[in-house]
Amino acid sequence: MRYDLVIFDNDGVLVDSEPISNRLLAGYLTELGHPTSYEDSIRDYMGSAMHRVHDLVEERTGQRLPADFDDVFHTRVFAAFERELKQVAGVEDVLERLAADEVPCCVASSGSHERIRVGHRTTGLDRWFDDDRIFSSQDVGRGKPAPDLFLYAAERMGVAPERCVVVEDSPLGVTAAVSAGMDVYGFTAMTPAGKLGAATRLFGDMRELTALLAEEN
């Protein structure tokens, strides 16, 4: 394998959280008087940090979301995670193969550290990623699509950007990885391939990833 580090996005790549999160986000925004469909939420907010939700709502309506918006939303999301959240199918096999091949991996997510921990604890992924290998947009000044988060993760893991590959499912994340000078594999399970066109490779089933990485010898 030509890569010395595999950097995983979290939501939609490791845990199947995007349907849950975007369903709840669309519902909460609509409840607050900002009509938003599930499809709107996927298009506008998937892969982004929470500040983007605040910024877009204010830009479009001139109104600010309530001060407790994030806290209420996360409470609802975490409760739903406990009931519904599962790993993305095939992830466990990929992680086992990387471990067997002694290829390091880490997480770099727009989500908060708390959100990542809750999701991993619920799905059992916490056995694969300790806190030293989890990086959040909270750790850097600018989130995706800026490259800062991926560059920070590579620096903390001690690997040069050109030796990293990122696994992403959002246009914002693909843009960030390309800007960081990293190869990026675009996961198209929820995102149309055309929106991830800047990715190095595209794949639609997580079970394909191990073979794709092996092709890069």
Model-identified regions with their sequence ranges:
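Asp-based, Mg2+/Mn2+-dependent phosphohydrolase catalytic module
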Residues: M1-D4, E96, S112-N217
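N-terminal helical cap/lid subdomain that shapes the substrate entry/recognition surface
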Residues: R2-D101, R117
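Conserved G/P- and acidic residue-centered "switch" motifs that form tight phosphate/ATP-binding loops
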Residues: D9, V13, S109, D169
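Residue-level marker of alpha-helix boundaries and capping positions
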Residues: D16, L85, V107, G141, ...
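Residue-level detector of anion-binding/catalytic polar loops
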Residues: P35, P104, D183
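Structural motif
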Residues: D44, A108-S110, V167
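Hydrophobic, well-structured mid-protein blocks that either form specific transmembrane helices
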Residues: P104-S109, G124
